[in-house]
Design a protein with these regions (language model features):
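Positively charged, small/polar-rich N-terminal and surface patches that mediate targeting and assembly
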Residues: 1-116
Length: 116
């Protein structure tokens, strides 16, 4: 079964937990793992070094667009990390993941279900 792993970082544990909670409450992610790390990166002409928290976000391919939009609206960084990796999982894990996510919103132009 297919799933998507999305990576982003936040400035500290509190911000990472708040972002994770919002994404989970909106059922855009089934699980989010948090890990403290040291990051070295280029920013505005300098090399920066910061403690950050990596978020490993597990979601479905169908929820990816809504997740990306929500994450970019909520994120504390001007340019948040957004890396997406396709992945495979067991059928059992995939069933749990799917049941944890809300159905994606219809895209413009998609036909509405009869009776709606």
């Amino acid at each position: 079964m297919k799933l998507v792993l999305a990576l982003t970082t936040e400035a500290n544990q509190a911000k990472a937990e708040a972002l994770a909670a919002q994404l989970l409450e909106q059922h855009l992610a089934a699980c989010i793992a948090l890990q403290q790390q040291q990051s070295l990166y280029h920013w505005q002409g300098r090399i920066e070094r910061d403690s950050e928290v990596q978020l490993l976000i597990k979601t479905s391919p169908e929820q990816l667009e809504a997740l990306q939009i929500a994450l970019h609206q909520m994120h504390s960084y001007d340019v948040p990390e957004w890396i997406v990796l396709p992945a495979e999982c067991s059928d059992g894990y995939g069933s749990w993941l799917t049941s944890s996510l809300k159905p994606p919103l219809p895209k413009p132009g998609d036909a509405a279900e009869p009776g709606l």
